[in-house]
Amino acid sequence: MLYLEDYLEMIEQLPMDLRDRFTEMREMDLQVQNAMDQLEQRVSEFFMNAKKNKPEWREEQMASIKKDYYKALEDADEKVQLANQIYDLVDRHLRKLDQELAKFKMELEADNAGITEILERRSLELDAPSQPVNNHHAHSHTPVEKRKYNPTSHHAAADHIPEKKFKSEALLSTLTSDASKENTLGCRNNNSTASCNNAYNVNSSQPLASYNIGSLSSGAGAGAITMAAAQAVQATAQMKEGRRTSSLKASYEAFKNNDFQLGKEFSIPRETAGYSSSSALMTTLTQNASSSATDSRSGRKSKNNTKSSSQQSSSSSSSSSSSSLSLCSSSSTVVQEVSQQATVVPESDSNSQVDWTYDPNEPRYCICNQVSYGEMVGCDNQDCPIEWFHYGCVGLTEAPKGKWFCPQCTAAMKRRGSRHK
C-alpha cells in the first residue's frame, strides 16, 4: 500500500519544474510585448517620415520592420509551445494519479468488497465545508447535520486552530464517547441480542446508505470497531495537511491490524419502499444475524441468505415468543429484497480495467488517429485537416524552430509548386 508515498515522491519536483517553466514563459511574454511596443513605435515613425525620404530608405525600413515582426511571432509561437509542454506535463501526472487510484481501489475491493465507497464518502464528509440550509431542509423539521467544529464563545477569539483539525477532533471525540458507552453496556451472553450494534442501524436523517457496523465481525463488538476507527482518525489527524488519501489508508490499516473481517452488508437508504414500516424489521433481523454469528463456535462468517438466517434464529431463540418466529418466517421475501438492495458492490468495479481508458468522445489527432498525449507539434498550415501531431509519429525529438509543416501538407505544397512550374 505504497501508492500514495510513491506518487508524492514522483510529484516532489513538479512544483519547482512548473515554477521554472512559468517564469520562463513570463519572461518570453514580456519580451514579446516589449518587441511589439517598439515595433508599433517604429511603424508610426516610419509613416511620419515616409514622404520625406527616398524609396530605397522606405523599402529598407519596411524589410527591417517585417523581419522584427516575424521574430516576435516566432517568440510567441515558442511561448505557446512551452504552454503546451506544461499542459502535457500536468496531464501525465493526472493520468498517473488516476491509474494509481484505480489500482489501489482494486486491491481494497479484493480484500473487502464495498469498503472503498465507505472510506471515500467518509473522506468527503470530513473535507467538505458545511453546506447552507436549502429550501427542502428549511421547510422540513429535520435538523441539518453540521460537521464543522464550533468552539465555545469563551475561547473563540483565542483559538486559531485550522478547520480540518476541528473536524478531526470532533469526530474523534464522538467515536471515543460512543465506544466507551458501548463497551460499558456490552453484550451479556452469546444468546442475547446484540444491543451494542443498535447505534449503527438505519439512521433516518441520512439519505445515503450507511455501513452496517454490526455485520463487520463475529467475535468483536461494535465498541472495538469504533475504537479502531477512532485510532485511524487520530493517526490521520497527526499527518500533514493536504494528504487526503492518508485518511483512507489509515482507516484501512486500522481495520487490518485489528483483524476485523469486513462484511458486504449495507443498511438500506431512506428512499427504498416501505422504509417507515420495515425499519423495525431490519433492526430485528440484523440483531438476530449478529447473535447467531456470535453463537457459532466454529467462528465462520454467517451467511446472508434466508434459510440460514431463519434456522439459526429459530435455534437460538427457541424460548422466545411465537410472534417473533412468525415475524421472521413471514418476512423471508423482505429479507431477500433487503439483502439484494443492501449489497452495494457493482460487478463493473471488480471487472474494470486498471489501465487508463480514454474517453470515446475525446478528439483524435495525428496520422495515427489517437488522442492527445505526450509532446505534440502543430502544423503551420491553416487548412491542415489534422493540425496536431505526436513527435514520434512525424520523426521529431524536440520542438522545431520556425514554421513546421506536416508530411501531408509538405507533399501537397510540393505538388502545387511543380504544377506552377
From Swiss-Prot:
CDD domains: ING_ING3_Yng2p (cd16858), PHD_ING3 (cd15585). Residues 308-323 have a biased composition (Low complexity). Zn(2+) 1 binds at C366, C368, H390, C393. Residues 286-296 have a biased composition (Polar residues). Zn(2+) 2 binds at C379, C384, C406, C409. The keyword Nucleotide-binding does not apply. Interacts with H3K4me3 and to a lesser extent with H3K4me2. Component of the NuA4 histone acetyltransferase complex which contains the catalytic subunit KAT5/TIP60 and the subunits EP400, TRRAP/PAF400, BRD8/SMAP, EPC1, DMAP1/DNMAP1, RUVBL1/TIP49, RUVBL2, ING3, actin, ACTL6A/BAF53A, MORF4L1/MRG15, MORF4L2/MRGX, MRGBP, YEATS4/GAS41, VPS72/YL1 and MEAF6. The NuA4 complex interacts with MYC. HTATTIP/TIP60, EPC1, and ING3 together constitute a minimal HAT complex termed Piccolo NuA4. Component of a SWR1-like complex. PANTHER family: INHIBITOR OF GROWTH PROTEIN (PTHR10333), INHIBITOR OF GROWTH PROTEIN 3 (PTHR10333:SF103). The PHD-type zinc finger mediates the binding to H3K4me3. Component of the NuA4 histone acetyltransferase (HAT) complex which is involved in transcriptional activation of select genes principally by acetylation of nucleosomal histones H4 and H2A. This modification may both alter nucleosome - DNA interactions and promote interaction of the modified histones with other proteins which positively regulate transcription. This is Inhibitor of growth protein 3. The gene is Ing3.
